[in-house]
Amino acid sequence: MLSTCNSQLDGILFSKPSKIVVYGIAGSGKTNFLLNILKCSKISNENIVYISTEDPVFINRAIELGLESSNFYFASALSQEHLISLILDSMQFNVITIIVDSINHLYRVESEKDYASKLFVDILVLLDSLNKKGIAIITSAQVKLEENIIAGYEYLNIWADKIIEIKVLPNKTRTIRIIKPAISHEIPFVITSKGIEWLYKT
């Protein structure tokens, strides 16, 4: 069972296998949030695949959090084509969830190439087809810092079932706000050496 260790948030995100996008500025805690899902989820005979498209720093954090279960598979994608290949390869496992951190990084890196948009759409279509088979898709997304707008928003807004924003407050507390579906309530948390600590845990 997928979990964030916050039952209120779990009820919103994981009532059924969905396509979820988590966005926020660099350093807001997107990767920590995704790794926290691994830490909190209770799975036995199924597997979660975690694919990073950025630097391998997440590996150190995963080790620090004790995420060494045989039910977790970690990989790094070097291009959008490589990401497609890794997603397809993950089907050899009994997968219940695919996490991509982040879904639009390689799209931004390759944006000047003619085929970049097509490959990005191909990735979303592939993930959509897997979601229809009952696999949860959870992704982070980078934003354009000066505008706080998701890169590839025109695609991701249509594709995603649920979109959440992570914001950093002046006191370093983070808050989660549900953008899609629109829910006004915000859920605060802090990041510690042991993972995410919910300030008002339910």
Identify the meaning behind each predicted range.
Residues 2, 31, 80, 119-120:
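A conditional alpha-helix N-cap/helix-loop micro-motif detector
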Residues 130, 135-202:
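Phosphate-binding/switch region of NTP-binding enzymes
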Residues 88-159:
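P-loop NTPase motor core
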Residues 36, 63-67, 88, 112-114, ...:
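Short, glycine/charged-enriched secondary-structure capping and boundary segments
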